[in-house]
Curated annotation (Swiss-Prot):
The keyword Ribonucleoprotein does not apply. This is Transcriptional regulator MraZ. GO terms for cellular component: cytoplasm; nucleoid. GO terms for biological process: negative regulation of DNA-templated transcription initiation. The lineage of its organism: Bacteria, Pseudomonadati, Pseudomonadota, Gammaproteobacteria, Alteromonadales. It comes from Shewanella sediminis (strain HAW-EB3). The gene is mraZ. CDD domains: MraZ_C (cd16321), MraZ_N (cd16320). Forms oligomers. The keyword Cell cycle does not apply. InterPro entries: MraZ, MraZ_C, MraZ_dom, MraZ_N, MraZ_sf, SpoVT-AbrB_dom, SpoVT-AbrB_sf. SUPFAM superfamilies: AbrB/MazE/MraZ-like.
């Protein structure tokens, strides 16, 4: 399970180094294989261990190609999907279209989301955090039944 936020840098070739604390679990459990795609709701990338991505693909197979919204989701997620493997230094290469989608240039945030990572441009991440704080303080949050009994 992946948790926590790590500040990372892209090198001149568009590679990122996965923090050391994640490398061993990724290697041992997932043979260092990752699938990267776009988040269709936010300007960030999603990095899935290959086994987790297989579950997403199974769900995508159930979507219709004749319904425009379902087809659009499949086209976006699968069209951008890129398989990669950590190199000997724990790095992965982000293809230019993926870097462009998330506006990734130099400084980024790798954020654990249990079964996957989100990869954000550092400035976009800070804006998103502020928006999340505002959402948590809103009436919409207070009225959410699924969160009514959630406590820390």
């Amino acid at each position: 399970m992946f948790r926590g936020a790590s500040a990372i840098n892209l090198d001149t070739k568009g590679r990122i180094a996965i923090p050391k604390r994640y490398r061993e679990p990724l290697h041992a459990e997932f043979n260092s294989q990752i699938v990267i795609t776009v988040d269709f709701q936010s300007p960030c990338l999603l990095l899935y261990p290959f086994d987790e991505w297989s579950k997403i693909e199974a769900k995508l197979l159930l979507l219709s190609d004749t319904r425009a919204t379902e087809r659009a989701m499949k086209r976006l997620l699968l069209g951008y999907a890129h398989e990669c493997e950590l190199d000997g230094n724990g790095r992965i290469l982000l293809p230019p279209p993926l870097r462009q989608y998330a506006n990734l240039e130099k400084r980024a945030m790798l954020v654990g989301q249990l079964n996957k990572f989100e990869l954000w441009d550092e400035t976009a991440w800070q804006k998103q955090i502020e928006q999340s704080r505002e959402t948590i303080q809103s009436e919409e949050f207070a009225d959410n039944e699924r969160l009514a009994d959630f406590s820390l």
